[in-house]
């Protein structure tokens, strides 16, 4: 009989955080486990709230985990508080050719704690009140991470009110293409969502969106 033991990597109240949600998990080329998730500081409610992206790392197959690191935090952009600069719903992937790790998340700016999916607006910039698709990357097996990279202008059209990654994980295809699933809605579709992928054929230097 095989017995499996679950390990609680993050629990409500850890590091004085209200809730942890929306996990994604990958194994790097070196066998390291990397988990990403929403760090929901004050409440378990979805964006727009005070939310950052946390990361946990294990080099022994998940038996032990290093202390949590915050890898995406949009701070008080434009002078607005953290609660109006939340970033959440992460996905993570490993570039199997280079072992570069990419994490994606959606940043929402200035909604004053309104629910993002219903209240974001069309446009391209944070000041437009539209969702921003952000990436970070690690080139040292998840030990350190880049500053956030905004790829909204590469993959979003102006009529879309919200474009965000599909939470969880992305993939590397056999030809080395990096792929994240995405979901979006546009002005003429109201609350109805559509799905597509974003992909990079140059190791993450540029990104493109497929048709729905």
Tell me the role of every PLM-derived stretch.
Residues 1-212:
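Asp-box/BNR beta-propeller blade signature and adjacent active/binding-site loops
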